[in-house]
Design a protein with these regions (language model features):
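Multi-pass alpha-helical transmembrane bundles in non-GPCR membrane proteins
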Residues: 1-215
Length: 215
């Protein structure tokens, strides 16, 4: 197993990974909140799946970005970080497929997003040096599959999901284009991406909470 090694502080912005580190601990609390407000056994199961995906995304990102890994483990951590993004997308769909969307559409969406997340993860591990735009495009495409199910989702939850999706998309574009890059030594384009992801996740968490509490 590789070990973390020290590298010059100016190789990455000082806030790299900080926001996702905080978000990871918030996600642990969020799991408990969702399980506590779940109205049924199915809702609790959906809350757990979503909560694990949420914590996994922020946890993998924090581990990857906060530690100065040596080259070999860094490449593996990058794989894990990117794969956790696709896991989060599938995890976010799960409560709505189990609790809100009617069959057979719910089963179709569930199969597509989990199948897509698995396939994207496999490709990610096989193509570690994929350009940033490729990861962004796959994430955006997988995330916006929900538009086919929006008519079945109540207005409040649908609006929250849409706003979160827009923020995720804006973050993916910032990541792919490497801009805006306001303060490269402290808060660069990647931090813009991370902040937008945290904001998007918080908004979509509210949508999941509504669905779980009513489920």
């Amino acid at each position: 197993m590789g070990r973390a090694v020290a590298t010059p502080e100016d190789l990455k912005p000082r806030l790299r990974g900080v926001f996702h580190q905080w978000a990871f601990f918030a996600a642990l609390v969020a799991i408990g909140v969702l399980v506590g407000i779940a109205g049924t056994g199915t809702a609790r199961a959906a809350a757990i799946v979503y909560g694990i995906a949420l914590a996994a995304m922020f946890g993998a990102s924090a581990l990857y970005h906060r530690i100065n890994w040596s080259e070999r483990p860094r490449r593996w951590m990058r794989r894990l970080d990117h794969s956790a993004i696709f896991l989060m997308i599938a995890g976010t769909y799960t409560p709505f497929c189990l609790l809100v969307i009617s069959e057979p559409l719910a089963l179709i969406v569930l199969a597509v997003v989990w199948g897509g997340a698995f396939a994207a993860g496999v490709i990610n591990f096989a193509w570690i040096d994929a350009p940033k735009w490729a990861t962004a495009v796959v994430g955006i495409a997988l995330g916006w599959i929900s538009v086919i199910a929006l008519p079945q989702i109540p207005v409040t939850e649908a609006a929250l999901l849409a706003v979160g999706g827009i923020l995720y998309t804006a973050g993916a574009l910032a990541y792919a284009l490497k801009r805006p890059n306001p303060f490269p030594r402290v808060f660069g384009y990647h931090e813009v991406f991370h902040v937008l992801v945290v904001a998007a996740a918080a908004i979509q968490f509210a949508a999941v909470a509504v669905a779980v509490s009513a489920g």
